[in-house]
Amino acid sequence: IFIVSEDLEDMDRGLSSFGAEIVQFNEVEQAAAQTEGISLILLDEFARGTNPEEGAMIVRAVTRYLDKQPSVSVLTTHYDGVAALASAHFEVKGLKDMDMAKVAEEIAASDGHIKGADIIASHMNYGLYRAQGAESCPRDARNICALLALKDEILKDI
């Protein structure tokens, strides 16, 4: 089992988080290639340390590469266009079945005793389901912003 995860910034070596991720990925890829049998490679939010456009291109290229390797690879990402390249696409159920009005009432009734983020987290479903076809990724960010009382002036521009 090989994992590339967390902030890997290495100031002693002069590496940014992104540079350190690439170094670690190369090490993982080489170790997996030398392993007999099938390896499990886990990439958590790979290429998050660079700009979103290049990060998405890198993750798509890595996905295509890993799909050809004798391994099982699991990538978590927020980048669009990656899932279409994967052999299988799973998503966190998230807030998909959440009743927004009910949660807004819970937050309003909490009188500040329970943080809104904690109430939202209590409704979060971290279960995975297999996404079908070109199903788009969940778009919960605006709803969360509204529940957490981001100013209306900002919300109207989202």
Regions found by a protein language model. Name each.
Residues 1-158:
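ATPase nucleotide-binding head domains, primarily ABC-like/P-loop NTPase cores
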